[in-house]
Amino acid sequence: IKGELAASRPWSAWVAEHLRSVDAGRPVEPPADDRRAVAAQATFGFTRELLTTVLRPMATAGKEPTASMGDDTPPAVLGLTARPVGHFLRQRFAQVTNPPIDHLRERHVLSSRTLLGCRHPLLSEEPEAAGMLELDGFTLTPDGLEALKDPALGLCPKVLDATWPVDDGPGGLRAACVRLGEEAVAAVRDGACLLVISDAAADERSEAVPVPSLLAVGATQQRLLREGLATRTSVVADTGEPVDSHQAAALLGYGADAICPRLTLAAAATLDQDPAAAQDRYRDALTEGVFKVMSKMGISVLDAYRGAQIFEAVGLDGEVVDLCFAGTPSPLGGIGLDELAADALDRHRAGQAEVARLENPGWFKHRPGGEYHATNPEVMQALHFTVREGAEMKGSKRGAHLLQQAVKGGGFERYKHYASLVNERPPAALRDLLATSPAGPPVPLDEVEPAADIMARFSTAAMSLGSLSPEAHETLAIALNRVGGRSNCGEGGEDPARFGTERSSAIKQVASGRFGVTPAYLANAVELQIKIAQGSKPGEGGQLPGHKVSAEIARLRHTQPGVALISPPPHHDIYSIEDLAQLVFDLKQANPTAEVSVKLVAEAGVGTVAAGVVKSLADVVMISGADGGTGASPLSSIKHGGAPWELGLAETQQALVANNLRSRCKVRVDGGFKTGRDVLVAALLGADEFGFGTAALLAEGCLMVRTCHQDNCP
C-alpha cells in the first residue's frame, strides 16, 4: 500500500516546484538614538533587570539564564508591580502518564521548522498544497518580515494594527481585541494567506497604545478558530514585547506561526561588538528555550505545539480567557481587560515621559521598593534571630541544648515576631487570600494531637548532597531525626557511613538518573520517594556540571570525578501508570517495611495523575508547588513552570475523594512553607504531611544570596 501511494502522484516534484525556502532576514542595526530606544522599551514593559538578567546572557552566551532558590515573588495577579500578560500563564508539563523529552540529549528529534501560507486539507492531492514558504526557525527580523510582503510570494499579506488610541482609555483594549478578530476574518475571506499582527504603530505615533501581544494574537486566533479559518492563513506577531522564551512559547502556543521581536533584536545588537552575532545568539537561545518548553510535554515538532495552548491561567478572569485563551484551564478567575489595559496605559505614559527611563521592579532579586519577596531580608533576619537564640552560650553545647536554651530564653516570642512578618505580609501566595474561621469553641490543649505526633508529619524537602555541603546535608538529617520528623536526602545517594545513625536521612529518593541507588541505600530508608517532577523545573531533568562532581560525590554516585552527571527528564522505565506501579512494587520488594511516595508537581490535571499514583499502590502522594527552591534551574522554568500548591493540593484531595481513594494514601505538600499558618491552610485543603525546604536551610544559616548555581556561596 505504501509503495502504491508513493507512486500515485509526483509528490517530490510538487514539493520541489512549489515549496520555497526563505530566510529570517538581515540583522537589525543598533539603534541610532538611545533616548528613543529607551522610550520604546519603556512603552513595551522592558525593565533594567530584564535586559541585564535575561537578555544579556542570551545575547552574549547564547543560552537562557540560570538561577537558584526558587521563586518567592507573588503570582502576577497579586504582585505589587505590573506584569506582562505572559506572567499570568503557567507552563504545563508531562508527569507519569507520558514522558517529557530531553531537549539537550535528544535534539535530533526536535524541529523548529516553520511553514507559512495557506494550509490545504490534509488529504489534498494537488500541487498547490505544497505551495508554502519554509523557515528554519520561528523568528524573523524586520527585514525578513518585509520580504514576506513581496507580491511575488503570493501570500497576499494583511497587516493588522495591534494598537488603540490613548484617548479611548481602558475600554480601547477590549475594542481593539474584537476589531483584530473581525479584521482577520475579513482578510482571510478576501484571500490573505499571511496576517501580520503588528504593534509597530506605537513606535511612530505617540497616541498609539500597543495591545499586549498575547492578547492580540490570542484574540485573533480564537476568532479564526470559531469561524473555521485558522488553517487558511498564517500569523506573524510583529511585536516589541517578547524577550524571554516563555513569552515566545506562549505566543506560539496561542497561534503565532512566527515572531518578529524587533525591539529585543535591536537591544541585543547593542550588547556585542558584532551586532549580527549577538542577534544570532539571542535567536539560538530563544529557540533552545522554546524547545525546552515543548519538551516538557513530550512534543518534539514545533508545528505540533503551535496553537496547542498548553498553559493554565492563574489570575485572569473569564472574559479574558474566553476572548483570547478559550479552553485554557483557569480555576481562579482574576483581573480583567480593564486592569490589563490600565497597565498598558501606564507603560505608554512611561514611554512618553520627557525623559523616559526603565524601572527595576525586582522580579528576580529583592530590592527595596520593588516587588515583594516572601524571603526578604527582614524575614530572614527574624528567622535567624529566632533559631540562634542562646548561641552566645559558652562551651560546645549544640543541637537540642541550644533549642532548649532558645525556648527558655524567649525563643517562642521571637518566633511569634517572625511569624507575624510572614502571616501579616501583603498577599504573596494564594493561601494569603484565605481566612480561617473557628469551627466551634476552642478545644482543650490536652485534647489536641501531641506535639510529637505533629512533628512526625513534618519533613524537609529533597535536597541532594550535590546542592548542599555535607555539613548542611547532615545537619538537616540530625535535626529531623531528633524532633521525630523525616529528612529527605534528595537524589544522588547518601554516604553508607551515615546509615543506622542519626545522620541518616529517613527519606531516600529514587530519581530518573538512579545515582547512588544501591540495595543498601534502599534498605536503610523509612520511606522511598520516586521523584517524578521538581517544583522549580517540572518536566525537566537535572545536570550536575563536571566541576561540581567531587571525589566524594563521585564515590556516592558511583561515577568518576569531574564528569558531568545527567538525570533525564523522564524515568525511562516509567511511561505510564502501569510502569509506575511496577517500580513501586520493585521498591517494596527491596524494602518491605518502607513507605513508597511519589513526588508530583501542581498543575491542572494533577488530581487525575494522583489517583493513578494511588492505584499503583504508592503510600504517599506528594504535591510540590511551583515556588519550590532549587540549586540550579533555568530562570524561565523557576518563574513560569507549574502551579501554586494550593491549586494542586485542592484538586488532588477532590479527585481522591471522588474516586474513593483518599483513605488509601497520605497526601504530603511542600513549596514555600514558613509558619504554622501555612501548615494549617494546607491541612484544611487536605494535606496530612508537610515539607519545609528553603525555610529549613535558612534556619541552619543560609544567607539566601541566590548564587547556588554559580558555586560561590559565601
What feature does the model see in each segment?
Residues 156-302, 312, 317, 323, ...:
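Glycine-rich phosphate/ribose-binding loops and adjacent secondary-structure elements
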Residues 488-492, 506-507, 519, 541, ...:
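Iron-sulfur-associated redox domains of electron-transfer enzymes in respiratory
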Residues 531-534, 541, 545-560, 609-629, ...:
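Active-site pocket-lining/capping segments in soluble small-molecule metabolic enzymes
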